[in-house]
């Protein structure tokens, strides 16, 4: 099996299975008919950005971007003081000096619910795509700023 196909299989397994370590990953690959040496698997994991991380259910192999994304989400969530809305817009209050980071975090998702954000020192004005979507936008903001 060539490298791109093997790495695709590795990616699929990591996304679909609870894999605690490279030994388990090696076993799962073998069960799927993929022959690979431990050293090659280790290099593939490094190239794919796979890390071993402690979760609530024990250790698990994860993609580094997923792990760091959850950490950043939790940190950004801790910077938010409140979320409020009126008939036309949503206001996210933050700790002093943190509004720009929270606004940037929301912008990176390119949500169709958000027309744009404007950040001051401790306040982010979130402009919805439509006033009819205010409640959906509030739910979306809570979901993406939750530490869970």
Curated annotation (Swiss-Prot):
It comes from the Bacteria. GO terms for molecular function: arginine binding; DNA binding; DNA-binding transcription factor activity. Gene3D superfamilies: 3.30.1360.40, Winged helix-like DNA-binding domain superfamily/Winged helix DNA-binding domain (1.10.10.10). It holds the Pfam family Arg_repressor_C. GO terms for biological process: L-arginine biosynthetic process; protein complex oligomerization; regulation of arginine biosynthetic process. Pathway: Amino-acid biosynthesis; L-arginine biosynthesis [regulation]. Its main location: cytoplasm. One of its GO terms (cellular component) is cytoplasm. It is found in: Cytoplasm. Keywords: Amino-acid biosynthesis, Arginine biosynthesis, Cytoplasm, DNA-binding, Repressor, Transcription, Transcription regulation. Regulates arginine biosynthesis genes. Belongs to the ArgR family. This is Arginine repressor. The lineage of its organism: Bacteria, Pseudomonadati, Chlorobiota, Chlorobiia, Chlorobiales.
